[in-house]
Regions:
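N-terminal Rossmann NAD(P)-binding subdomain characteristic of aldehyde/semialdehyde dehydrogenases
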Residues: 1-52, 91
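Glycine-rich phosphate-binding loop at the start of an alpha helix
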Residues: 29, 46-49, 68-71, 75, ...
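Hydrophobic packing residues within well-ordered alpha-helices of enzyme cores
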Residues: 1, 74-77, 104, 125
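PLP-dependent aminotransferase-like
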Residues: 48-102
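Phosphate/diphosphate-binding loops
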Residues: 115
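Structural signal for hydrophobic packing residues in well-ordered secondary-structure cores
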Residues: 1-12, 81, 85, 108, ...
Length: 167
């Protein structure tokens, strides 16, 4: 949330040399345009929100394809967003098969693809994107440590599995 206040840009003094004394520089970010997001099956709500929140803050419309096995978190997030003051058409949550997601990569109207998942799939998607900007988060390793003196290993395993696939 804190980073969203810096999206519009900043004004900086350019006093790094005597020649620049009294000069200021300004940079401004502008929305990239419509974005496409493909989120993974693990941490389905959290990793979807990591894509959606910056797009909303920057004013970029988006389409989100949640993982086929865990779409509920993204669907519920879409229902919540539908009750906000976001403009109609600002977002779409589109659960679909991998084959049905080709437009997420090849449609030139979508200016950015953000994908979280396996390296093989990610690099394949990037190769199909043409001039579109691509953000890849590949091959995560969310390690879990279980102490050797854990009293109930079956309970620990059950909680780890629940936490991994929680919706």
């Amino acid at each position: 949330a804190e980073e969203s206040v810096r999206i519009p840009g900043e004004l900086q003094t350019l006093d790094i040399s005597p020649r620049a004394k009294g000069y200021r520089g300004m940079w401004k970010r502008v929305p990239i345009g419509p974005c496409s997001f493909i989120s993974p099956f693990n941490f389905p709500l959290n990793l979807a929100a990591h894509k959606v929140a910056p797009a909303i803050a920057a004013g970029c419309p988006f389409v989100m394809k949640p993982a086929s096995r865990t779409p509920l978190g993204a669907i519920i997030m879409g229902e919540v967003l539908a009750e906000t003051s976001l403009p109609k058409g600002a977002f779409s949550i589109l659960p679909c098969s991998r084959d049905g997601a080709d437009l997420f990569t090849v449609d030139e109207r979508l200016k950015l693809l953000s994908f979280t998942g396996s390296p093989g799939v990610g690099w394949d998607l990037k190769a199909k994107c043409g001039k579109k900007k691509v953000v890849l988060e590949l091959g995560g390793n969310a390690a879990v440590v279980v102490d050797s003196d854990t009293r109930d290993i079956d309970d620990a395993i059950e909680r780890i599995i629940f936490g991994t696939f929680y919706q």
